[in-house]
């Protein structure tokens, strides 16, 4: 196969996003030593607006749009995203070419004073940017106070260290990628904090017309992770199609079978619906839709319709 002479990766400029882009850069450089692989760092709208909760300003698609523009106008050949930030429906003209092997999918409890969530006194302030985490926290620990936490990973840790929060909840994978695993006091079992759709996996997006890149990027695709993430995204698409609602899903492959658990909740956690399904790994989208149907049968549509739409 003739690999291109050059490849440009579009990435957000945060430390975590650049780590992820550099990881993919290294993989590509190893696969194609003759190809020059460079990174185009970009500041996205989501990185610039830090004084409002994500749900209010348009959701996680704000982290993706500028990168897609770079793909559309030819400044970049591929974009690297955290899969949990990728909107459920890509705009026309774009495609996911590969999903990398999943890292730790769990949420991490980070605190300077407490060993785990159960040890937090009533009234403690916990920071998170995620309605998914907020609803699960409030359902399990209604005595805690959950407040919005924005900014990159280092900013969030600084706010914790300044005493603005008793604890914060972050993605374990991000902390580990940046060499900050020592900050994790507890990795929360997915049974107790169902991860975001795609959490821990990286997605590689391309201009859909660049069919030449599909073979080039194919070695980066991890079929088992891709099946799990596609099942999770299938559930989310069937229910809401947005990153910014209190839902989560986590799929695992065992042999030829996918097992998946998902939930939908009110933001305050007072209404909480959870279901599980299993089915053939070669039909991930259908499995996601089946899980969504089970949640709808329990009343998920009513909960989602009652959420504030800003």
Curated annotation (Swiss-Prot):
More info: The porphobilinogen subunits are added to the dipyrromethane group.
Catalytic activity: 4 porphobilinogen + H2O = hydroxymethylbilane + 4 NH4(+)
Gene field: hemC
Residues carrying S-(dipyrrolylmethanemethyl)cysteine: 243
Family indicated by similarity: Belongs to the HMBS family.
Group of enzyme by EC: transferase
SUPFAM superfamilies in UniProt: Periplasmic binding protein-like II (SSF53850), Porphobilinogen deaminase (hydroxymethylbilane synthase), C-terminal domain (SSF54782)
Gene Ontology cellular component terms for the protein in this record: cytoplasm
Domain of life (superkingdom): Bacteria
Cofactor(s) required, per the database record: dipyrromethane
NCBIfam families noted in UniProt: hemC
Keywords assigned: Porphyrin biosynthesis, Transferase
Pathway(s) served: Porphyrin-containing compound metabolism; protoporphyrin-IX biosynthesis; coproporphyrinogen-III from 5-aminolevulinate: step 2/4
EC number assigned by the record: 2.5.1.61
The protein's name in its UniProt record: Porphobilinogen deaminase
Textual note on the cofactor: Binds 1 dipyrromethane group covalently.
Protein source organism: Methylobacillus flagellatus (strain ATCC 51484 / DSM 6875 / VKM B-1610 / KT)
Disulphide connectivity of cysteines: none
GO molecular function: hydroxymethylbilane synthase activity
The protein's role, per its UniProt record: Tetrapolymerization of the monopyrrole PBG into the hydroxymethylbilane pre-uroporphyrinogen in several discrete steps.
One GO biological process term: protoporphyrinogen IX biosynthetic process
Keyword Transit peptide annotated: no
A Pfam family matched in the record: Porphobil_deam
Subunit structure of this chain's protein: Monomer.
CDD domains per record: PBP2_EcHMBS_like
Classification via InterPro entries: HemC, Porphobilin_deaminase_cofac_BS, Porphobilin_deaminase_N, Porphobilinogen_deaminase_C, Porphobilinogen_deaminase_C_sf
């Amino acid at each position: 196969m003739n690999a291109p002479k050059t490849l440009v990766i579009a990435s957000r400029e945060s430390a975590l996003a650049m780590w992820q882009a550099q990881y993919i850069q290294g993989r590509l450089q190893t696969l194609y030593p003759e190809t020059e692989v460079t990174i185009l760092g970009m500041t996205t709208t989501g990185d610039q607006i830090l004084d409002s909760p994500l749900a209010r300003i348009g959701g996680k698609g704000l982290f993706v749009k500028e990168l897609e523009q770079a793909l559309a106008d030819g400044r970049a050949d591929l974009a690297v995203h955290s899969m949990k930030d990728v909107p459920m429906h890509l705009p026309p003209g774009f495609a996911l070419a590969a999903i990398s092997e999943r890292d730790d999918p769990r949420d991490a409890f980070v605190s300077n004073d407490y060993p785990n969530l159960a040890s937090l006194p009533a009234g403690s302030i916990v920071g998170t940017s995620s309605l998914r985490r907020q609803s699960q926290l409030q359902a399990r620990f209604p005595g805690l106070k959950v407040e919005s936490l924005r900014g990159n990973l280092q900013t969030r840790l600084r706010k914790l260290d300044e005493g603005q929060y008793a604890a914060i909840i972050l993605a374990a994978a991000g902390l580990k990628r940046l060499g900050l695993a020592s900050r994790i006091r507890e990795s929360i079992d997915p049974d107790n904090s169902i991860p975001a759709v795609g959490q821990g996996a990286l997605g590689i997006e391309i201009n859909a017309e660049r069919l030449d890149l599909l073979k080039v990027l194919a070695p980066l695709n991890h079929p088992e992770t891709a099946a799990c993430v596609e099942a999770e995204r299938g559930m989310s698409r069937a229910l809401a199609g947005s990153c910014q609602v209190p839902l989560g899903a986590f799929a695992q492959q065992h042999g030829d079978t996918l097992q998946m658990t998902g939930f939908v909740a009110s933001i305050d956690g007072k209404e909480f619906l959870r279901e599980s399904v299993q089915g053939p790994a070669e039909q991930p989208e259908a499995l996601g839709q089946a899980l969504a149907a089970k949640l709808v049968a329990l009343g998920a549509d009513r909960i989602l319709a009652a959420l504030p739409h800003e």
